[in-house]
Structures are given as C-alpha cells and as structure tokens.
Amino acid sequence: MVMDQLALHRYWAVANQKMVGKILSEFAYEQAFQFEPTAQGYQLNLENGTRYCFAGEENIWGQVMIDPTSITRHAEIEADEPISAALLMRDLQPLLKMPDDAFAEHLEDLNATLLGDCKLMQRNEAITARDLAMLPCEQQQTYFDGHPKFVFNKGRRGWGSDDLKRYAPEAERVSNWVGSRFITRFCSSPPTMKSHGKPCCKAPSRPMKSSRWTVCWLPISLDSTIIVMFRFILWQWSNKLALLFVREIATKQLVYLGEFGDHFLPQLSLRTLSNVTRPAGYDIKLPLTVMNTSCYRGIPGRYILAGPTASDWIDQVFKSDPLLIAKQAEVLQEPAAAFAAQADYALLPNAPYRYHELLGVIWRESAASKLKAGERAILMAALMESDNQGQPLIAEYVQASGLTLEAWLSKLFDAVVIPYYHLLCNYGVSLIAHGQNVTLVLENHAPKRILLKDFQGDMRLVSREYPEQASLDDSVKKVTVRLPEHLIIHDLQTGHFVTTLRFISPLVAKLGFSEPQFYRLLGDRLKAYMAAHREYQPRFEQFDLFKPRILRIGLNLAKFRHSTDASASRMLPDMDDMLNNPLTKALEHQG
C-alpha cells in the first residue's frame, strides 16, 4: 500500500488531467455534447453554470484531441477547484441523466482507473519508449494503458487492492495454475458440462504429485464418466466457484486440486494468461467474474464450445487461400475447450449473465509457438502507446527498421488490413480486429504478417449464405451472430479503423506524416488490393469502405445506461449516428 500511496501522491494531479481530457474528448466524439470554439481553443458550457476551457486540435475523425495541461474549470458560484475527473463527472451527471446509484458504481470504476493510471505512470518512470518497444510481447503489454475508447478502462470492479497487486497485468506477477476436476455422467438430455478437445502430445502443465493427474488434458473418458481438468484464477475460485458451486463440491462432482504446474502471466485482457515457464506452450483463457470496461469478464459457454471448431475452420481457410498464404497470416488455434454450468443457475435463463459464465477454459496456441527465426511479436495495441515523455513506440519501430514512415505504414496496412478485408469479402466472415486481438509479427522491426485469435463472440458472419461458408460446421453457425453487409462492414471500420487506427494516426502525425496522408495511404493499399482481385468486385460493392458517411459507434454512454449487474445480456453499443469517413476525407484533402 505504501507504493500505491507514493504513486497517488506523485501522479494524482496528472492522472486527473489526462482523465478529464479523455472524458471530454471521447464523450464529445460520442455526441454527448458539443464544444464551442474560442480564441484560445474550445470550451464546454454546462447548465449548472460551469465552464471547461482547453486547447486542442480536431483530428480527421472530427474528434477534438485535448491538451490535458490546458484544461481549466470555471464555476459561476463556487471558487475554481483543481481539475478533477470525479468533479467533471458530477458536473456532467444531469446531462448524462445518470441516477445516483449508477453514478456511484461508475465512480468506483473511475477511482480504480485513476489508481491504476498513477501506478502505471510510476512504473513507467524507469523505462523509455525505446526500451519498452524492445520488450517481449508478454512483458511489454503489462505497461500498456488499456482500452483506448473506454474512459474507465481499469475499473476491475470486484477486485481489492491486494487482488490488483496479484492479478492486474501491470503488477507483472506470475502465478501457478489453479486446478480442479469436474466429473459428470452422460445423460439423454444435454449435460450441464460439455467439452470439446483433442489430445495433445504435451500436457499443458507440469505433472502433479499425484500420478493420477500426470496428464492433465481433456477429455479423459472413463466408461460413462468424463473427467475434465479446469484451470482458473485463484480469485475466481475463492470468490465465486467455492461458493456458487458448493452443491457440486459437496457431491464430489467438482474437486479442488490446488496450485501447481507452470507459471503464467496475465495479459492485457485480464482473463488470458501466458505461459512464462514454456512460452511456446498454450495460453489459457478463463472466465473471470470481474466487471471491467463494458461487462463482467466471463465467457459464454456457447462460444467456448464453438471456439475450437471455428478456429479449425478459419485455420483451414488461411492455409488454403492463395492471398492469405502469400500474406503469411496464421491463426492461433484453440485445440481444446471446456465449460461447466452450475446446475441451479442453468435453470434460470433470465438470471444476470455473469451467473452463466463462471467456469470454463480455452487452450490457445501462443504467439511464441508460431514465430520463425528473426521474427518477434507485438500486439497492435503497442502502436498506440507512448512513454511518460510522450515518445510513441511506433517511432522506435520505424527508426529501427530503417524504412521511411510511408514504407513502414504500407507494410502495416498490407499485413493487417488486407487479410481482414479479404476474409470479409471472400468468405463473409468478420473478426473484430481491435488492438488486443491482432498480433503483429515484425521482422527487422517492420510489419511482416499477423496472427489472428479470439473466436468467442468476436467472430461474425454475413446474413446471407455464402458458398464459401459451406464447410463451416453448423454448430458454429448456430451460435455466431449474423449481420447484413451494411452492418458487418463496421466490424472492420469500427473494430479496427476507429478503435485502433484512430489512436495511431495522431501519433504518426507527430512524426511528420499527417492524418490525411495516413488514411490516403490506407485507401491506396485497399484500392491496390481491389484492383488485383477484380473477381470480387460485386463483394467490394457490398462491403464498401469508401462511403462518405459511416456509423459512429458509442461505448461509454451506452455503458452508463446499461444495468450490468441485473441484465441477462451484455450491453450493446450506440449505433444511431453517422460520421464522415476519413478514407473519403483524405481523398478530398488531396484534391
């Protein structure tokens, strides 16, 4: 706690300035309010007589990028106070129509995020952008800021300060597996425990002391009984499973086995862990009943069970499609997965969704297992990060590569955007390519290829039946969301352009390559791909990335309106506004 206090004492004011700037900028982008231009920059006038003034520049997305150090607050009645994120939220509460009970919950997320921000800034004191850029991927992401769009991106509601020190990515604390076995008998009706898996030559953990559990994989069939080894974070056992699965524990269906095996490090997503004992071993993705950003971080059973089949199919696509082979893109497969529902909650379909997502496990190939000689992996999110002095990591990669900015970015767009767009146009499949889902493989510090992952809920299919999907198993089609062409295109536009490139292009602009140049280059690479594959022209027209107006997707305001604790489903984003397409604006700027 002493270190936490030191971080708060040193960085509290700076963290609040940055948070206020992000709140004002993102909320205005989501159309919560509009700024008024002034001679010095911009101002926001609120109904309570309060005025926020600041300097900033409007980017190509129509969003004002605010200088946090320039923000001042002026009140009609009370004396001016230091810049405070909590105070800003109180000023905005009437405008956001947020009742006190909801406000209190989000205030908890705000305070936890500010604490996390202060600790990160303290941790980043001793590291430069150059040093951070060269760290291994698993260690590097423990320095990252988190979700770029959600203003309260380290809420982790449910964790206390001790939990943060043990489980938060920025704590960079490794831990052992925590395991249990779940036993169920087959019955004629669908069982509450299901598994999907295939045997592997290596067990995913070190042998346990008991010889019975030397091989810990799934499924292991014993007559009419199936025994599945589950992994989970110790917090999940202590705070959820040991209480909510008490019936299964009492009847010896669920048996706690304790901590053992390899050491794992939490990734930026909290619920995915990397094997640091054997980096080429499997990552594991686990349900975690902690509220962070938009939802509780459980995993729906239907997605867990469909994941291995979906990843098999996507992998076959990438191994057989000539363009994807040429791009050397690969899939991080999910060779096995398991899910167990608690018997009583399974009978309550309208219960809050977090009670249906308590116990499961997904084994996923690690990025390290796919790398060739001379390659290294980073998350796409790394390109959005800067050090404490504001030096972007992307600048370090470009400089180390010896390439021009334009050449480096051309390689980036060819390696990342083209495979995702090709997958959509040729197969009617979208994968949400946000900064955590895209693993970028570098060679000589330049973009070379991508590794794709996450097929539980972040994969969608076009509404109409495409013949290219004929070989996709019905079990996957049944649980996968389908969207018409004019909506599914926004998985690329919003999932990648808005959520990732929107935060990279301003950093590149600082390096002398303007945002119009950035998006014009992206458009040029897309047009080059389209010109080389005219056989897909009808699909290109259906999935048109160059329409003048595109959907504006809002997350923060939607979260404030959603009753997460009581809801049987996750929040849905706002999709009721349009914005000018940067790809089109960049072409107009050229003219």
Curated annotation (Swiss-Prot):
One of its GO terms (molecular function) is aerobactin synthase activity. Pfam families: FhuF (PF06276), IucA_IucC (PF04183). Keywords: ATP-binding, Ligase, Nucleotide-binding, Transferase. The keyword ATP-binding applies. Pathway: Siderophore biosynthesis; aerobactin biosynthesis. It comes from Vibrio mimicus. InterPro entries: Aerobactin_biosyn_IucA/IucC_N (IPR007310), IucA/IucC-like_C (IPR022770), LucA/IucC-like (IPR037455). This is Aerobactin synthase. GO terms for biological process: aerobactin biosynthetic process; siderophore biosynthetic process. Belongs to the IucA/IucC family. The keyword Aminoacyl-tRNA synthetase does not apply. It catalyses: N(2)-citryl-N(6)-acetyl-N(6)-hydroxy-L-lysine + N(6)-acetyl-N(6)-hydroxy-L-lysine + ATP = aerobactin + AMP + diphosphate + H(+). Its EC number is 6.3.2.39. Catalyzes the attachment of the second N-acetyl-N-hydroxylysine to the carboxylic group of N-citryl-N-acetyl-N-hydroxylysine to yield aerobactin. Involved in the biosynthesis of the siderophore aerobactin which is a chelator that mediates the high-affinity iron transport systems induced under iron-stressed conditions.
